[in-house]
Amino acid sequence: MNQKDAAGRFPEPVKAAAGLKRKTTRLLLPALLLSVLSGCQKEAVPKSSAAVPTTPASSQAVVSKSDALLALSSYDNKYYNQYGTYGPSYKANYWFDIAKTKRMDFWTQAEAIETVIDAYNVNPTVDLKNKVQYLYHGMRDAYGLTWSNNEFNDDVIWGSIMCLRAYEIWNDGGMLTMARQNFDLVWARGWDTTLGGGLWWKTDKLSKNTCVNAPAVICAMKLYKATGDVSYRNKAKMIMDWMVPRFYVASTGEVKGAMNTSGQIYEGALLYTQGTFIGAANELRPYYTTPDYRAMGLKAMDYARNSLSKTPGGILQDEDGTLDTQGGKSIFARWACMFVKDTGTAANYGPWLDANATQAWSIRNSNGIMWNLWSIRTSDTENLNSWRTNGGVSMMLNLYRFR
């Protein structure tokens, strides 16, 4: 997940940055984030203006499932676009911004579709099921069946995960085939023994990043469960075995972001990479007793709570410096909440995640839209992009995996 330019491409990795995409313009973030952003990032964005302090989350009522569904409905009112037929069905996409200047970028589009899948998972309705299909059709319509022309291996993996999660709802063989073919594409061009293994972030083979390797573990495990082909589980284990000693800091739970061709780490933890590592550990956990993936996931969760929040145990950091990181909370919420549900750790992490959802909802604007700056009220006048405003929706919905 890295930030791209207007043409949808991402910059070369730069020193002190790595797992994101778009143009890697230097981030105008607090010192906390300056040390961690870059490898997969693509373009920097200007600072937001108008900001109105909000009531602390601790004094707010807990968000309800109906609130979470309303948040998605408000989001869809601004960004969802059903634009035509697709065979006997329909196709749709999410707009990039409120002004509808273009469709959402490839990988963020896939992530926004995953948020609709999250909604279906916690509230299965015909309407949400159909939206998942229409949006999937929109991806096929815009990008075709295989994505070899996309140089970003992580983009291809994000899209494949979306297809697999849609397949879990629809049991549509085309969704599974699309995921399988594109994962196989990334494996063929991205995996080698340079630096001991791992997937390259891009086809230029200048860095190996968590933003592709952790999601690839998730993708491979989902392919294994969908097909029964044990080679995918083996690939997931190979990736994780390579990633853990290089990116996971066992003493703290931090997950580093990227490594250059000299084997030097040049990016620290970000919410989306921390979250997908937690998701990867959770996918492997039921199948392997050693290493202890549950313990790794717990440690990574603790690091996010203590060090990727504005205060220990508080509200998640903004990560507002690039387009890619603006929606990082969306990805973190998904995989963190799945982990909490699957490991039965709601008593430990639930209050913290709930406080974040409550705080996000408390800063919504008059249209029910929440940006990623969860300490100030969302602007009513800014042309907000759809990735920046996805995190609160995801956090609210994914709580209901374990609540």
Which positions does each model-derived feature cover?
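Oxyanion-binding "anion nests"
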Residues: 273-288, 293-309
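Extended ligand-binding groove/face enriched in aromatic
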Residues: 129-226, 230-237
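N-terminal secretory signal peptides that target proteins for export/translocation
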Residues: 1-22
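Active-site cradle of extracellular carbohydrate-active enzymes
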Residues: 213-216, 220-224, 232-281
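CBM-like carbohydrate-recognition segments
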Residues: 59-115, 119-154, 166, 208, ...
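Bacterial Sec-dependent N-terminal signal peptides
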Residues: 28-66, 70
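Structural signature of alpha-solenoid helical repeat junctions
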Residues: 108-111, 124, 155-158, 175, ...
